[in-house]
Amino acid sequence: MKAIKYLLIGALLLGFSAPSMAQNDAAITQATQIIKATSPATVEKALKDIVKANKKNPAVLVGIGHAFLDQKNTELAMKYAELAMARDKKYAPAYILAGDVEVAKDDGGAAAGWYQQAKYFDPKNPDAYFKYANILRGRSPEEAVANLNELRTQRPDIAVDALAARIYYSSNMLDKSMQAYEKVDKSKLEDVDITNYAMAGYLSQHRQKSLDMALYGLNKNPRNAAWNRLAFYNYTDEGKIEEALQYADRLFNASDSAKISGYDYTYYGQAYLANKQYDNAIDMFKKALTANAESKDLANSNKKSLSDAYLAKGDHANAISYYEEYLKNVKEPTATDLAGLGSIYTTMAASQTGEEQKATYLKADGVYKQLGEKFPANIDFANFLRARVNSNLDPDTKQGLAKPFYEALASSLCQKANRDNVDNTRLIEAYRYLGYYYLLKEDKSTANGYWKKVLELDPENETAKQALGMK
């Protein structure tokens, strides 16, 4: 894994300077094709003429070595690095290749030694500094950045702060990465830097900065998939849905080499849902569910999103079905998770009448009862929800169905020393219900006791004042 990390950072992120050999050199291209197509046992024989013709050309020898390294043939890659060194002992790219070979073998210490030699022989080669810094970053990103500062004096034309930002980004030090990038003139940033900055901003909730950088990049290349994706995500998170849908379309239909992921479908579904395009949202969430089939947690999250979309559409049966699937598969369901199912039932009941409505409210009550049993620390929450459901089952309060739950809630909350505003609001609701209940029962003394308690919490409560004859 270390090797993969080092090579990805060193090869994919670096872009300020390519090795000194020309990528389009005919000899390297020809050799690379042979290496890809020939078995390891006979490849050197197949390369004989090319090597003979270029035995004094260290750039070609290093190019051949890189071709072997790309095929994970570290033995022959190192051989050609050594051949290049033998031809020119001061040729820095040969030492960089040797370092890359050691990285592929997970020997960071040996790789560091080769990169240091490359720095020694060519103090102006940014590859050597950056790759050496990537070895150091595992131990100390700050030390790695300090190493890059040596390059600043050697190559004032290089945006060293951008290189430092890459180190911080690869070390998941996102704020420091952004701060380093902000020291660099935008015009000197390469595509990878624009992507890094925009991604760092997105991940660290600096959405406007992320969006601004993504849009800056899109001015250069409107078909860049990563930048269209980040613009789409940020606009969705910011609730700017028209813009979100615009960039979603650009990601899906007007980006080069876009690999659409489950996250993309999920975000598209959220944007459609926010725009009340429920059928489109459902379609996208189903595509996300398929794309995320290998990830149980992501797929389960998509089931909840499908439930939300069906609920918004008014399709309560599907909303309940997907939510129940979500609850079955969530690792550690919370009280809020369970309450979500009850909420769907209460929403469904509000659209019904008669016995059908009563049956649905009873299902909601059953869910909230289960909530209180499974999560005793949330018993006040459960009693509050059950009180409301039972109030709906007994709208004229004649049966007092909500009474035991409001009594339990009031008994608990009145003894709570550190009540917050939510607690006080619920306590007032409980006292008001109980005051009205006893008023209907013509037990004025008990009713007045509850109305007075309402005024203790809310001295300006008009209902309580009227009940007590104060108005």
Regions found by a protein language model. Give the residues of each.
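Alpha-solenoid helical repeat scaffolds
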Residues: 2-8, 12-440, 463-471
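Alpha-helical oligomerization segments
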Residues: 444-469
